[in-house]
């Protein structure tokens, strides 16, 4: 037996421990938590946030920055790092191209470049998130300061956080901030077409990412009970035992009712060019120019009401804007609707929409509006929480807000205004008219808001509650620690050289041309391949025994690794030594019998394949009739049953249901982590439906000319080569392109 496989025997006798890991080291008698936050979209820096510049730079951006600052000031925290995207774009500040940026003595921003260099809106980031996940795993693997928690914010970060968490065994906390299912529900209720919603928002990918994040989360932090009990409850992978309500807080040093004449003068000058009678009580809205914020409905309600036009001004602080031609389409459409409504109802002199304001002016704007006995208005179609409501309330400004989501809970605690159905134009107009009609009630609401925010929504209370949860949950975290043990185990010998070529037995090696096969055989055994220390592996959906028999007919060199059963089994070399660590990792929450039972009544759509095609971690079906609706149906059924399983379709007819943590892509990353082989030195071949996941991220890939059309969407990936030839000839072309079997490869 070789030294390498003796090592396997030793490792296989190690305990596959899934008990919670050790709590962090103590600093000055207190636990020194190391926290990694993922905030991927928008424009994020340590100061002078460009809030409202676009739909992606809003309340979440401010919350993450303030949370990082506050956590860094706590003795219980050793370090806070916020991971975001590195952007190199002349349209935005050079600040966003700095790889590292300090926030505070114990907090920093770390930026990773993934996808194009230019600034992208969040819906365009999805194809590049696997690249970030691979980079982040590599960074943390090599770091001496691995975090105790990953906290992912929004669906995109949730997706990356889930991948990093399961690969490295780091507990994951997740905050959705807003949820895709709720957004879809609201947009459909407002008359939106599902196809158009999908095109604008990539809503299916977002919901899938949220389900993945929830499936891997040890802690889900929500802002309200309604968000926890109603919005998250619509997700099949949501476990209510993992959810805690920790309402965001308000910085009382910035948001308070005590104003001064200088700041009021500055605000008045900001608005003076718009308003004929600036002394009127304002109806104030502060938000991004986003469809979801529903500002045109507010303008229309104001324009239709003689009472409101006579009594109030309308002040819309919708972020900063420069040249409207540089705005994204959604922003332009929102502003155009506002301009059209102002013109239609002749609201000139009664509506203000300043082009610029500073972030430090926002508290003064609230106080100015309160001094004018105005109202704060939040007409959003959906509002997961509503941090601006707390800012307004802390400043003594009563409000009228949407009855969706967080505002209901905030106003029930604060008793400082009205909630209305903002989808009903008459209801919104009536609420605005009633709220401003009674001066004594306005005064009572103002006092109530200031007192309630101080009592229920202080920033200190938020941070204390947050840290208490982090420390308590860490002690009983159920995150699998197999990966953590592997990274801590000195492996020594590896079964691989410096590169690894993975060929698919079911496609590129299926019925190969004899000349092409001979060429591959010669290249794999050539001195140059030996000098390049190139290893060879086989991937297949078949069981190992069947795959070995088929492979023997090809007369190729023996592979160093077999990845079989659609990525659920890993075996090494001639001894066919199974990797028990991989089996232990993917077995978490896997319920094979429950999968079969859950799908047993779908006989009109699928039927079980023969027993020889089944596996311990794979349930295989044949489709009765291929079609685009089958995979979503299976996915929905599995989620509704609370099963941590993932369906995947290959060649339009073959459906496999695997554990949530298993796939060919994940198996490759497991090998990379276990044996220290860089992903950039692994070459995969793709051609079939279902291979799109395989070519994401850092591994190099060859897509043969006879590929399924679904792979055409991967042409933007930098490390994917689309060959001009089919099958094995296309593989040989790809090997030549990368010079993969040469001593000096393009990948080095």
Task: Put a short name on every predicted segment.
Residues 497-515, 695:
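Asp-based phosphoryl-transfer active-site loop
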Residues 1-390, 394-478:
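Catalytic cores of nucleotide-sugar-dependent glycosyltransferases that transfer UDP/GDP/TDP-activated
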Residues 596-697:
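Conserved acidic, metal-coordinating active-site core of Asp-based
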Residues 152, 222-223, 401, 538, ...:
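Short beta-strand scaffold positions
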Residues 519-611, 706:
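Active-site phosphate-binding/coordination module
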Residues 658, 665-748:
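Mg2+-dependent phosphoryl-transfer enzymes with acidic/Ser/Thr/Gly-rich catalytic loops
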């Amino acid at each position: 037996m070789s030294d390498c496989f003796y090592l396997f025997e030793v490792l296989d006798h190690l305990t596959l421990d899934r008990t919670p890991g050790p709590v962090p080291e103590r600093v000055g008698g207190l636990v020194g938590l190391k926290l990694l936050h993922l905030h991927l979209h928008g424009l994020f820096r340590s100061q002078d946030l460009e809030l409202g510049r676009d739909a992606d730079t809003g309340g979440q951006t401010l919350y993450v920055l303030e949370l990082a600052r506050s956590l860094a000031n706590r003795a219980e925290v050793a370090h806070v790092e916020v991971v975001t995207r590195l952007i190199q774009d002349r349209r935005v500040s050079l600040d966003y191209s700095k790889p590292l940026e300090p926030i505070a003595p114990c907090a920093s921003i770390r930026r990773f470049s993934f996808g194009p260099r230019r600034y992208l809106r969040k819906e365009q980031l999805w194809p590049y998130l696997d690249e970030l996940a691979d980079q982040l795993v590599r960074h943390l693997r090599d770091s001496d300061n691995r975090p105790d928690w990953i906290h992912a914010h929004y669906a995109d970060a949730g997706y990356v956080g889930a991948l990093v968490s399961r690969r490295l065994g780091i507990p994951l906390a997740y905050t959705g901030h807003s949820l895709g299912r709720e957004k879809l529900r609201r947009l459909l209720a407002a008359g939106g077409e599902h196809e158009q919603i999908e095109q604008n928002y990539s809503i299916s990918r977002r919901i899938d990412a949220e389900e993945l994040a929830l499936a891997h989360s040890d802690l889900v932090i929500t802002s309200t009970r309604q968000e926890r009990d109603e919005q998250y409850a619509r997700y099949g992978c949501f476990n209510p035992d993992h959810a805690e309500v920790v309402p965001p807080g308000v910085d009382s040093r910035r948001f308070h009712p005590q104003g001064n004449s200088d700041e009021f003068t500055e605000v008045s000058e900001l608005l003076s060019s718009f308003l004929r009678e600036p002394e009127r009580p304002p109806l104030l809205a502060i938000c991004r120019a986003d469809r979801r914020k529903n500002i045109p409905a507010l303008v229309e309600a104001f324009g239709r009401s003689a009472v409101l036009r006579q009594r109030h001004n309308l002040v819309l602080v919708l972020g900063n804007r420069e040249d409207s031609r540089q705005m994204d389409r959604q922003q332009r459409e929102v502003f155009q609707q506002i301009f059209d409504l102002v013109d239609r109802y002749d609201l000139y002199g009664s509506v203000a929409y300043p082009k610029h304001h500073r972030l430090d002016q926002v508290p003064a704007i609230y106080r100015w509006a309160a001094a004018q006995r105005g109202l704060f208005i939040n007409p959003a179609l959906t509002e997961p929480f509503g941090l601006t409501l707390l800012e307004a309330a802390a400043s003594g400004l009563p409000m009228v807000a949407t009855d969706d989501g967080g505002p209901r809970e905030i106003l029930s605690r604060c008793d400082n205004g009205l909630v209305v159905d903002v989808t009903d134009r008459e209801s919104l107009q009536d609420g605005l008219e009633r709220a401003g009609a009674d001066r004594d009630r306005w005064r009572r609401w103002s006092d109530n808001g200031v007192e309630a925010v101080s009592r229920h929504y202080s920033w200190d209370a938020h941070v204390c509650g947050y840290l208490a949860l982090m420390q308590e949950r860490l002690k009983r975290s159920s995150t699998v620690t197999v990966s953590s043990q592997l990274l801590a185990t000195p492996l020594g010998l590896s079964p691989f050289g410096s590169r690894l070529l993975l060929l698919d037995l079911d496609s590129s090696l299926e019925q190969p041309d004899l000349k092409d096969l001979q060429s591959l055989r010669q290249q794999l055994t050539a001195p140059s391949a030996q000098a390049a220390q190139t290893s060879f592996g086989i991937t297949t959906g078949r069981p190992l025994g069947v795959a070995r028999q088929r492979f023997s007919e090809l007369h190729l060199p023996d592979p160093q690794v077999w990845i079989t059963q659609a990525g659920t089994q890993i075996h090494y070399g001639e001894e066919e030594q199974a990797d028990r660590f991989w089996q232990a990792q993917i077995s978490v929450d896997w319920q094979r019998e429950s999968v079969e039972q859950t799908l047993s009544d779908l006989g009109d759509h699928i039927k079980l394949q023969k027993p020889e095609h089944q596996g311990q971690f794979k349930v295989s079906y044949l489709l009765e009739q291929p079609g685009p609706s089958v995979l979503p149906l299976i996915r929905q059924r599995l989620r509704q049953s609370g099963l941590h399983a993932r369906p995947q379709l290959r060649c339009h007819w073959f459906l496999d249901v695997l554990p949530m943590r298993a796939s060919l892509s994940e198996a490759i990353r497991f090998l990379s982590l276990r044996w220290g082989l860089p992903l950039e030195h692994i070459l995969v071949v793709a051609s079939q439906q279902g291979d799109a996941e395989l070519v994401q991220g850092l591994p190099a890939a060859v897509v043969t000319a006879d590929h399924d059309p679904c792979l055409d969407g991967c042409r933007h990936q930098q490390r994917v080569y689309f060959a001009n030839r089919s099958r094995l000839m296309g593989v040989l072309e790809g090997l030549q392109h990368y010079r993969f079997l040469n001593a000096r490869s393009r990948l080095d």
